[in-house]
Regions:
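Short, internal strand/loop/helix patches
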Residues: 140-178, 182-183, 190-191, 328-361
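A short beta-strand-turn-helix
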Residues: 65-86, 257-278, 298-304, 350
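Conserved redox-active cysteine motifs that mediate thiol-disulfide chemistry
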Residues: 92-104, 282-299
């Protein structure tokens, strides 16, 4: 049995969180077959979240904050007192819905900054509260370091603040999902909260409630619509951390096996007979760059394994070193298909897999379902670049269809 399949039951029960349904919307989904108990527990958790973290009431004062930003500075509510209108939007790195709105958030800054509006983004999630499979649409996690990488990658023109350490600010504002926007007037009274517009795909949005609210406040008029539903990824409160640990522990409990691989087996591997996106990494225990990058490659697979991605590791250690290879793989919890070449003829290994491979290890290749090479690299890979390439090429369907384009942009 495929080792990943042994996790299917567990993953099915938490798939809604993975694709990021808001708690109120998640309750409308059908329970995954055979997972009634876990589904009931999930619904109960979402209900508790809404009760324990109510959304700030319209007309309420903006709660104060002092949070670190991706620029290395501390930012407080009072820093924005000169702005006649303040928009605070809760976003997250990992959420595909939030990613799809990044361009629209940047456009709000571009279109309204000259009119005195300040927009601030806050990341509310506890990094340890997101399960590995919930990171299946992202290159980075929800940590402050991940935020810095995302802000630089997407050139955010706004302050991006981190609340994941204590979630004290998120507790006061009560964002149900990311993205969730709150707009305050000159007296810092909440005049609008909800969605930015009415469709994940920008071209299909017909109602732009956040812009309507900004225009009304700048003109001194009442906001036409003060509240809307929100759709996105549920806020990852630290109370979810136990569930995230459970998934990681389930992965780490999987058996780690090692197969001998002949030249013919390597040639079959290169043909990608399973017709999924295939990540292949050739490595050795004596290779420092291999050992350094391997945990990051494995983590990448752990995040994306629900999206038709396979990962195969191939050790080029001498066959006599099988025990050392097994020890390394077991320590790394490498519960994937692990191969070790059955020969000391490394040039034969290279020719059997890729006749154009003309250097040593590490050697990494990404093969498309139809067998063509998407990426290959001799030497240690840039893991962020590799993740972005995978995200641009993995199947792109469902509620977040169009997300691959975000990574190709």
């Amino acid at each position: 049995m495929d080792k990943t399949a042994t996790l299917a039951t567990w993953i099915g029960a938490t798939l809604v969180a993975c694709i990021g349904m808001a708690p109120a919307l998640a309750a409308d989904q059908a329970a995954p077959a055979g997972n009634d108990a876990r589904w009931t527990a999930y619904q109960a958790q979402m209900s508790r979240d809404q009760q324990e973290h109510p959304t700030l009431a319209l007309g309420a004062d903006a709660p104060g904050f002092a949070l670190p930003g991706t620029d290395g500075k501390l930012h407080a509510l009072a820093d924005y007192k000169a702005s006649p209108v303040l928009a605070i939007v809760f976003i997250s790195n990992h959420c595909p819905a939030s990613q799809l709105y990044e361009g629209r958030i940047k456009a709000l800054v571009h279109d309204y900054a000259a009119r005195g509006v300040t927009l601030v983004a806050i990341a509310p999630n506890g990094p340890e509260a997101a399960s590995p499979h919930e990171l299946n649409y992202t290159d980075v996690d929800d940590s402050l370091e991940g935020m810095k990488q995302r802000a630089a990658f997407r050139q955010f023109p706004f302050d991006y603040l981190y609340d994941g350490e204590t979630q004290a600010v998120a507790h006061q504002y009560g964002p149900k999902v990311t993205p969730h926007i709150f707009i305050f007037d000159s007296q810092r009274k909440l005049r609008y909260e909800g969605r930015i517009d009415d469709h994940l795909r920008e071209a299909r949005a017909t109602h732009h409630e956040a812009r309507d609210a900004l225009d009304a406040l700048l003109a001194g008029r009442p906001v036409p619509v003060a509240h809307t539903p929100v759709f996105g990824c549920s806020t990852k409160w630290m109370s979810h951390a136990a569930s995230a640990r459970e998934e990681l522990q389930a992965w780490q409990a999987q058996p780690v096996t090692l197969e001998a691989a002949s030249f013919d087996a390597l040639a079959r591997l290169r043909s990608n007979p399973d017709h999924k996106t295939l990540l292949v990494n050739f490595w050795a225990t004596w290779c420092a760059p291999c050992v350094h990058e391997y945990p990051q490659l494995l983590q990448t697979y752990l995040w994306y394994r629900s999206r038709d991605l396979d990962f195969v590791s191939v050790s080029v250690d001498d066959p006599s070193q099988r025990a050392s290879v097994e020890k390394f793989l077991a320590t790394a919890h490498s519960a994937i298909r692990n191969l070790q070449v059955d020969t000391d003829d490394v040039y034969g290994v290279m020719a059997a897999f890729d006749k154009a491979w003309d250097s040593g290890v590490p050697f990494t290749m990404v093969i498309a379902p139809d067998g063509h090479v998407i990426f290959k690299h001799a030497g240690e890979v840039d893991v962020l670049a590799l993740r972005r390439l995978l995200l641009a090429n993995l199947p792109d369907a469902g509620p977040f269809a169009g997300n691959a384009e975000y990574w190709r942009d």
